[in-house]
Amino acid sequence: MISVNDFRTGLTIVVDGQLYRVLDFQHVKPGKGAAFVRSKLRNLRNGSVNDKTFRAGEKVEKAQIDNRKMQYLYAQGDEHVFMDLESYEQTELASSAIEYELKFLKENMEVHIQSYQGEMLGVELPNTVQLEVTETEPGIKGDTASGGTKPATLETGLIVQVPFFVNQGDVLIINTEEGSYVSRA
């Protein structure tokens, strides 16, 4: 058990039998009445984000999340196959469980798979990934002076806004949290 006073961003807890990750929290001490903790929680099973208020000092169960390093192998219909790098055991995850992460996954990429009591929860991506541009308008000389952007389709199907000097075939570094262009690789 952990006190809500000890909340921190990224902490995984169990509330009412549901598994949540703390996205944001704020300790509130009103002038009148008891202190409380206002929090924003993401349900790890269905992805919904909920606001929940706890009384100061209230205890919640801390969840033990297992992180295993795995390699993304391939997609088979609606399932995606990952291989444990230590035991070579293969695990399948449904597309619906990793819908956002699929925009950044490419074959043979190493990721961390999160599980709770044997139940696979999802994929933890690295902060940045390198993806190749498969389609974009060609850059025209002199375009960089205006500092504008254009859409580019990457090898995973993700569409990001990139500077005019980026061309088809370039490898880009993409921020996985925001889904945005960082730089050329």
Curated annotation (Swiss-Prot):
Record pathway: Protein biosynthesis; polypeptide chain elongation
| Cellular component GO terms, alphabetical | cytoplasm
Where does this chain mainly localize? cytoplasm
Per UniProt, the keywords (alphabetical) are: Cytoplasm, Elongation factor, Protein biosynthesis
Entry's PROSITE patterns? EFP (PS01275)
Which SMART domains would you find in this protein's record?
Answer: EFP (SM01185), Elong-fact-P_C (SM00841)
Return the CDD domains for the record. S1_EF-P_repeat_1, S1_EF-P_repeat_2
Compartments where found: Cytoplasm
Asked whether the UniProt record includes Mitochondrion among its keywords, one would answer no
User: Gene3D superfamilies this protein is in?
Assistant: 2.30.30.30, Nucleic acid-binding proteins
MF (Gene Ontology): translation elongation factor activity
Looking up SUPFAM superfamilies in the UniProt record yields: Nucleic acid-binding proteins (SSF50249), Translation proteins SH3-like domain (SSF50104)
Please tell me whether the keyword Cytoplasm is annotated for this protein: yes
* InterPro entries on file: Elong-fact-P_C (IPR015365), NA-bd_OB-fold (IPR012340), Rib_uL2_dom2 (IPR014722), Transl_elong_fac_P/YeiP (IPR020599), Transl_elong_KOW-like (IPR013185), Transl_elong_P/YeiP_cen (IPR001059), Transl_elong_P/YeiP_CS (IPR013852), Transl_elongation_fac_P (IPR011768)
**Which GO BP terms apply?**
peptide biosynthetic process
Protein function: Involved in peptide bond synthesis. Stimulates efficient translation and peptide-bond synthesis on native or reconstituted 70S ribosomes in vitro. Probably functions indirectly by altering the affinity of the ribosome for aminoacyl-tRNA, thus increasing their reactivity as acceptors for peptidyl transferase.
Q: Which family does it belong to?
A: Belongs to the elongation factor P family.
Q: Which NCBIfam families match?
A: efp, PRK00529.1
Q: What is this protein called?
A: Elongation factor P
Quote the gene name from the UniProt entry: efp
